[in-house]
Swiss-Prot record:
Signal peptide: none annotated. This is Probable butyrate kinase. It is an enzyme of class 2 (transferase). The lineage of its organism: Bacteria, Pseudomonadati, Elusimicrobiota, Elusimicrobia, Elusimicrobiales. GO terms for molecular function: acetate kinase activity; ATP binding; butyrate kinase activity. It is found in: Cytoplasm. It comes from Elusimicrobium minutum (strain Pei191).
Length: 370
């Protein structure tokens, strides 16, 4: 059965909207907000952005002459809620309250659920979120660190990791809950997850940057040297956070997080106009190989979490477009399994659309947020 689904995916500087009739894309549009527009909300509650983003949404629907009464469901990007199990959740009063107050932080993704609920409620239609970044299915042993005061957290690319895992399971002729996968999502940050029978029982932190170094994240650092930097008086806490979560990894070593530009430079010696690469080709090659080495090592670590019982390794996100990276990871981790799936990119709107369709076709899978 085909369903008409409206997808709302707000980001820090943009909104992505999609409307679908079954497999057909009716439209997909993005709004990029100017710095001036965003600066007008500086220091204000996130909810004050709702009128701006609502106007874009309604204007787009009007532009494409969408009959609102034909919409079967609305789904928004999940925000910083309580840590929850993966799955599809109806946007109930408890969730709405936590999105509005920013239970786990304030980010424009919180507005996805708020706007979805608002539109759906006016139409008397169901509304959902699916697999937000706060999905937490980690087993107790995975939470431990060597400090009693510090626990490992589950923050990762849950929406895309779950989507590609479900896709890979179908290609194997199985259900997701019957499979064990290691999934690597690589973008500005990298998360590597151990998927055991439908749950991500351990995963590297793709937000704070624990795990391998990435195009923008530092990854795990030697503890003592980091402590010494913290107390050196040379950095504020904001500066160190930026070094770890925006200026680390490939940016720190090569001057860029643009992997396409970096690899072209490694291969041909040519940089794109305006390139920020600031190192030799040899240094760029070694840093790139070091990142691949660390990602591969994290995949190997997750194989031990699954006790070697791995149906496939899945590579996704923007990094999966780079054939050299994919081939080097396969070379290093092929002893774990000979089955690899590569799904470059990460289509959040498609993932949300598919989640809403599953919910409409199988209402029993819909979860309640508490």
């Amino acid at each position: 059965m085909e369903h008409n689904i409206l997808v709302i995916n707000p980001g820090s500087t943009s909104d992505d909207i999609g409307y679908y009739k079954g497999p057909k894309t009716v439209f997909e549009e993005s709004a990029r907000y100017s710095q001036e527009e965003l600066d007008s909300f500086a220091g204000k509650e996130l909810s004050e952005q709702i009128p701006l983003r609502r106007k874009f949404l309604l204007d787009v629907l009007k532009k494409h002459e969408i009959n609102l009464n034909e919409i079967d469901a609305v789904i928004g990007r999940g925000g910083l809620l309580k840590h929850i199990e993966g799955g599809i959740y109806t946007i109930n009063e408890a969730m709405l309250a936590d999105l509005k107050r920013g239970y786990n932080g304030h980010h424009p993704s919180n507005l996805g659920g708020i706007l979805a609920r608002e539109i759906a409620e006016s139409l008397g239609k169901p509304c959902f979120i699916a697999d937000p970044v706060v999905v937490d299915e980690m087993e107790p042993l995975a939470r431990y660190t060597g400090f009693k005061e510090i626990k490992r957290k589950s923050i990762f690319h849950a929406l895309n990791q779950k989507r590609v895992a479900i896709t890979a399971a179908k290609e194997l002729g199985k259900k997701y809950k019957e499979c064990n996968f290691i999934v690597m999502h690589g973008g500005g940050g990298v998360s590597v997850g151990a998927h055991k029978k439908g749950k991500v029982i351990d995963v590297s932190d793709g937000f704070e940057g624990a795990g391998p170094m990435t195009p923008q994240r530092s990854g795990v650092l030697p503890s003592l040297e980091l402590v010494e930097m913290c107390f050196s008086g040379q950095y504020t806490i904001q500066e160190l956070r930026k070094k770890m979560r925006g200026r680390g990894g490939m940016i720190a070593h090569t001057g860029t997080s643009d992997i396409a530009d970096l690899y072209n430079y490694i291969s041909s010696g040519k940089k794109k106009p305006g390139s920020t690469i600031n190192c030799s080709r040899e240094a760029a090659q070694e840093a790139f190989d070091a990142m691949i080495y660390q990602i591969s090592k994290e995949i190997g670590a997750m194989a031990t979490v699954l006790k070697g019982d791995v149906d496939a390794i899945i590579l996704t996100g923007g990094l999966a477009y780079n054939e050299y990276l994919v081939n080097m990871i396969k070379e290093r981790t092929g002893f774990i399994t000979d089955k690899f799936f590569v799904y470059p990119g990460g289509d959040e709107k498609a993932a949300l659309k598919e989640a809403a369709a599953r919910a409409l076709e199988n209402p029993e899978i819909i979860k309640q947020y508490k």
